[in-house]
């Protein structure tokens, strides 16, 4: 606030940081950060934790590091607070086509829907070699890789992968109602079958059921 009062024209003021106006603008500065983050990850040869980035790029806030990662097509999340880059991936066309085919098969069986756990379990079942080649050890890892590879083919919001345009707002509640065919009434048993099939967590399914009860009322023990 004091700097803005005395030097209103010398800096570009943002909520968490400022940039001197006689150097590159935010976009160009972010591009340089992108490249530096990418080079750092390549040098490490593995996904890196947010704290490693903050140690390497001292003085940068979380938002200053996250913005370039989200904006750069070569950078992506790996899991909670971990980030990776395209250069570390080992996918050939056969791998990409196989992963796409698995997603499509799951969606064909579930009206255009696939969860990260459904996808991961299916790749394990098919003994896909790209899991080991890319050190993919969890549904979250695979979700972010799929998001990176197919961001323009499907809609992603973890843990959900959906056919483009099916949902205006991707949420477990909307997906559950869609898979239940937007019924006037439904039973807890029907809902539980959806939860089990989609491999949603107990916490998620409980929260969604609570939200659904705001729009539906109980008329029996199971409905």
Mark where each language-model region is:
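C-terminal non-catalytic scaffold/interaction domains in large multidomain proteins
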Residues: 1-223
